[in-house]
From Swiss-Prot:
The keyword Protein biosynthesis does not apply. This is ATP-dependent protease ATPase subunit HslU. One of its GO terms (molecular function) is peptidase activity. ATP binds at residues 18, 60-65, 256, 321, 393. It is found in: Cytoplasm. One of its GO terms (biological process) is proteolysis involved in protein catabolic process. The gene is hslU. SMART domains: AAA, ClpB_D2-small. ATPase subunit of a proteasome-like degradation complex; this subunit has chaperone activity. The binding of ATP and its subsequent hydrolysis by HslU are essential for unfolding of protein substrates subsequently hydrolyzed by HslV. HslU recognizes the N-terminal part of its protein substrates and unfolds these before they are guided to HslV for hydrolysis.
């Protein structure tokens, strides 16, 4: 779990996302509260429930980007899902409980990676010994036991030195490595996961833990043997317990496009992918127990962050019970031309930086001037105002149109330098920005 302070989290988010300070503060506080809760005594910790968040704002202002960046910062089980993917229980489609199953899978993978990292040094030592045994089989005595001699030991040290220096990487050896497990995917109806897991376990046990002799280059054999030895050093049952504990106490679920499951007006017949999904989300957010292939998972302390543009629907169109379970409301603001200008230059790996790097691969130098960047930002903002406002995503469309000619001719213009100034931007984009019909269909 991340131990970053709210200020540090906001600072890290600022490196990738422009503006939206209120949203950043809310998610930073929510993330820090996960850590604070874990410092409490057990009796009080159980009572402290997460304050779920509802982010409201037009499309393209950074809601999903905040989720993406938060996933990297959290160092905890994190999953982002689209609300529109789910249907009510009993109908064809994914049910909302699969969110927790997927989150548990993420946690198991994360815990497994962390455990493998801890034993990596020991696994490398064991893998090295197995490769040296394949290169220099130890001599055996009359009883078939390994016999160590000074000469053998010296030769082994010479080979060990060469192996560590990478001088033997391309040499081929024949070695026993674990055969890949037979993957059996069984599709089962909702609620039958336990039976599916038992069948999968049965098929895998039939295959057994067989090893197979393979001819590999030493560098490839070394990687395979490290994984094999590390897996032997890790207790899989303990890993599952740790993963479930991590999900229950540190798990974060980000539900995007929640406005798309709001009920719109009066409609007859069952609303299986809208209000039905909202009702199914209630017990999950309030706290329930979900059966997964790794064990039972309680959702009482999982943090839920929901987001939606709410351009057609309103937050009040969500069913009242769900509104009550998302107590923290954050409104994200629409982006101005000044914000667009900052987006083009300030974030790490900004759009302009990406295009400069891409063209550099063709030995073409690109320079964006200050007035050129201002003109690009103005063009994107103007098109958003006159047509549909799609936020920062408009910059991708505008930049592609602007760089179209240079990108196409880059191979023939190797060694050339292009300066993207206001005049060049006006020449390439002027007619599209000024003509509403052209901007509507092309930009």
């Amino acid at each position: 779990m991340s131990e970053m302070t709210p200020r540090e989290i906001v600072h890290e988010l600022n490196r990738h996302i422009i503006g939206q300070d209120n949203a950043k503060r809310s998610v930073a506080i929510a993330l820090r509260n996960r850590w604070r809760r874990m410092q409490l005594e057990e009796s009080l910790r159980v009572e402290v429930t997460p304050k779920n968040i509802l982010m409201i704002g037009p499309t393209g202002v950074g809601k999903t980007e905040i989720a993406r960046r938060l996933a990297k910062l959290a160092n905890a089980p994190f999953i982002k899902v689209e609300a529109t993917k789910f249907t009510e229980v009993g109908y064809v489609g994914k049910e909302v409980e699969s969110i927790i199953r997927d989150l548990t899978d993420v946690a198991v993978k994360l815990t497994h990676q962390q455990a493998m990292e801890k034993v990596k040094f020991r696994a490398e030592e064991l893998a090295e010994e197995r490769i040296l045994d394949a290169l220099l089989p130890p001599p055996r005595d009359a009883w078939g036991q390994n016999e160590q001699s000074e000469d053998t030991s010296n030769t082994r040290q010479i080979f060990r030195k060469k192996l560590r220096e990478g001088k033997l990487d391309d040499k081929e050896i024949e070695i026993n490595v674990a055969a890949p497990q037979m993957g059996v995917e069984i599709m089962a109806p909702p609620g039958m996961e336990e039976m599916t897991n038992q069948l999968q376990g049965m098929f895998q046990s039939l295959a057994g833990n067989t090893s197979k002799k393979r001819k590999l280059k030493i560098k490839d054999a070394f990687k395979a043997l490290i994984e094999e030895e590390a897996a032997k050093l890790v207790n899989q049952d303990e890993l599952k317990e740790q993963a479930i504990y991590s999900v229950e106490n540190n798990g974060i679920v980000f539900i995007d496009e929640i406005d798309k499951i709001c009920k719109r007006g009066e409609s007859s017949g069952p609303d299986v992918s809208r209000e039905g999904v909202q009702r199914d989300l209630l017990p999950l957010i309030e706290g329930s127990t979900v059966s997964t292939k790794h064990g039972m998972v309680k959702t009482d302390h999982i943090l839920f962050i929901a987001s939606g543009a709410f351009q057609v629907a309103k937050p009040s169109d969500l069913i009242p019970e769900l509104q009550g379970r998302l107590p923290i409301r954050v409104e994200l603001e629409a982006l101005s031309s000044h914000d667009f200008k900052r987006i083009l230059t300030e974030p790490r790996a900004s759009l302009t930086e990406q295009y400069v790097a891409l063209m550099k691969t063709e030995d073409v130098d690109i320079e964006f001037t200050e007035d050129g960047i201002t003109q690009i930002a103005e063009a994107a903002w103007t098109v958003n105002e006159t047509t549909e406002n799609i936020g920062a995503r408009r910059l991708h469309t505008v930049m592609e149109r602007l760089m179209d000619e240079i990108s196409f001719d880059a191979t023939e213009k190797s060694g050339t330098k292009f300066v993207i100034d206001a005049a060049y931007v006006q020449q390439r984009l002027g007619e599209f920005v000024e003509d509403e019909d052209l901007s509507r269909f092309i930009l």
